[in-house]
Amino acid sequence: MLDLKMIRNHVEDVKAKLATRGVKPEAIDDLLAKDNERRELIVKSENLKKLRNEVSDQISQLKRNKEDANDKIQEMRKVSQDIKGLDEQLENIAEEVESKAAHLPNLPHEDVPVSLTEEGSVEQRRNGTPRTFDFTPKAHWEIGEELGILDFERAAKVAGSRFVYYVGDGARLERAVYNFFLDQNNAAGFTEEITPYMVNDASMFGTGQFPKFKETHAGYEVKDEGLTLIPTAEVPLVNYYRDEIIDEEKLPISVTALSPAFRSEAGSAGRDTRGLIRMHQFNKVEMVKIAKPEQSWNELEKLTTHAETLLQKLGLPYRVITLTTGDMSFTAAKTYDLEVWIPAQDKYREISSCSNCTDFQARRAHIRFRDENGKLQYVHTLNGSGLAVGRTVAAILENYQNEDGTVNVPEALVPYMQGTTVIGKK
């Protein structure tokens, strides 16, 4: 949530920055008009409450003097009714103001490339050289199906499209990957959590998924329960601190969690219809940092660097790009995408997004800290995948495949596979 006071004081700057994210200036004008109406009602209500107090004092004085107070009593009743009516209007308008403000995305950082589409993202660096094959590399779903370690057909029978069964060494590889990620994250100072996989509406609002997810049907809601299956562990990890004041000395906080992620993939018809790239349910290891404002940009670089080390230790070629203003998530002020090389597609595909959300989520979730001067401030929140597990499995199957259909296990994962170095058909 953007600070209304900041919007009022920097209207044209806010309009210009949000225009790079596709927000029309009328949206800001509508918000401020409604906010002005709310503020005018507050003044009227406060004036009437002041008048009510004055009339009440006059009634008391008349009664002490044993004089007739009926006219003043009638006046006070009318004032009280007017106050009640104004307060009801105020409540309705306050909801409208919050709703309009809740639909505005975060302001982009000044060095984010400006574009309303993904075109224009800036590549920062690459690591590793994509392998040159002396045979035509197969897609990961072909490899998995031929080895009997991925079963999309039975998953479709049981649940529908965009689901998968991991079988045998496929399940072991998936487990090896996420245990490796969690161990690396723990070693880097992240505190591991096991979170709820369903959250309430306030939590989804706090991290910025609602109201957009409700309107676009991007998630899975549990009917009549007020719960939603999490699209990422970012939601419960950040909301752990919702409505709390954190001790300053505890900042920055780094937490991590493995969880399933549930996505309806609304609007993705025809895209990545095969394989592990775009699923309705997939495992993901998430990383979240909560920091003081002056720490957050350095923490974003550290978060991104750590995500890179995971790919480096797995020997997977990747690149890092800075997303454009129009391609970032709703809550982000700046995002680095890590894209891993997928040989069968002959291109890099996203495997992690590392974002600084500044105080945007903290305002929605009311997460604050008290600074050294005793002043309450909003924290900054950051998040990043560390990493998407299914996409990592896909990248391993494709980058480590052999001509005979077998797959070599990355050296870092061999201990997690109980010494298995090659996955073959059984």
Swiss-Prot record:
Protein keywords: Aminoacyl-tRNA synthetase, ATP-binding, Cytoplasm, Ligase, Nucleotide-binding, Protein biosynthesis
Subcellular location: Cytoplasm
Sequence positions that bind L-serine: 232-234, 286, 385
Any GO MF annotation of the entry: ATP binding
Keyword S-adenosyl-L-methionine: no
Recorded metabolic or biological pathway in which this protein acts: Aminoacyl-tRNA biosynthesis; selenocysteinyl-tRNA(Sec) biosynthesis; L-seryl-tRNA(Sec) from L-serine and tRNA(Sec): step 1/1
Catalytic reactions of this protein: tRNA(Ser) + L-serine + ATP = L-seryl-tRNA(Ser) + AMP + diphosphate + H(+); tRNA(Sec) + L-serine + ATP = L-seryl-tRNA(Sec) + AMP + diphosphate + H(+)
Superkingdom classification of source: Bacteria
Residues noted as binding ATP in the record, renumbered to the chain: 263-265, 350-353
EC annotation from Swiss-Prot or TrEMBL: 6.1.1.11
GO cellular component: cytoplasm
GO biological process: selenocysteine biosynthetic process; seryl-tRNA aminoacylation
InterPro entries, alphabetized: aa-tRNA-synt_IIb, aa-tRNA-synth_II, aa-tRNA-synth_II/BPL/LPL, Ser-tRNA-ligase_type_1, Ser-tRNA-synth_1_N, SerRS_1_N_sf, SerRS_core, tRNA-bd_arm
The keyword Lipoprotein is assigned to this record: no
SUPFAM superfamilies linked: Class II aaRS and biotin synthetases (SSF55681), tRNA-binding arm (SSF46589)
Main localization of the protein described in the UniProt heading: cytoplasm
A family per Pfam: Seryl_tRNA_N
Subunit structure: Homodimer. The tRNA molecule binds across the dimer.
Known function: Catalyzes the attachment of serine to tRNA(Ser). Is also able to aminoacylate tRNA(Sec) with serine, to form the misacylated tRNA L-seryl-tRNA(Sec), which will be further converted into selenocysteinyl-tRNA(Sec).
Protein family (similarity comment): Belongs to the class-II aminoacyl-tRNA synthetase family. Type-1 seryl-tRNA synthetase subfamily.
UniProt note: domains: Consists of two distinct domains, a catalytic core and a N-terminal extension that is involved in tRNA binding.
UniProt name for this protein: Serine--tRNA ligase
Organism (species): Pediococcus pentosaceus (strain ATCC 25745 / CCUG 21536 / LMG 10740 / 183-1w)
